[in-house]
């Protein structure tokens, strides 16, 4: 368990931060950009959880824990199999959940406008932020070694959040399609 007696360390005042291997990197480095985007995704999911309960809340809480682990994987340069927290089984779980949720939804006939119920709107925002996290992880992977399961997980997560948003709108009987009245 982590115990912090002080929140500030002053070690980042020069524009650098520490990674878990004790190395220092600039706060604008691709690795820190990716970690920050993952943190933003988790925070957006936390806001969405204000409108959830039961299984949906538990699912989103588990995803937040996964994102914490994903950020921890990103904070470790290199790739050691014993060190990885995000593994293919988590990607497969997201896929199963996507398939299960999608079974109860009507087929898509147009693009979906973000919005609808408050929960759906928050899930769409989390989805868009997760796409930013994905782009940041892809950029990092272009420069350094990244656990391939991280890319798979964050890619599936945006799909998962999209399907959850559709389900939230269906349950709230409030769906928005991208069909303009002409």
What label would you give each PLM region?
Residues 1-182:
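Phosphate/pyrophosphate-binding loop motifs in nucleotide- or prenyl diphosphate-using proteins
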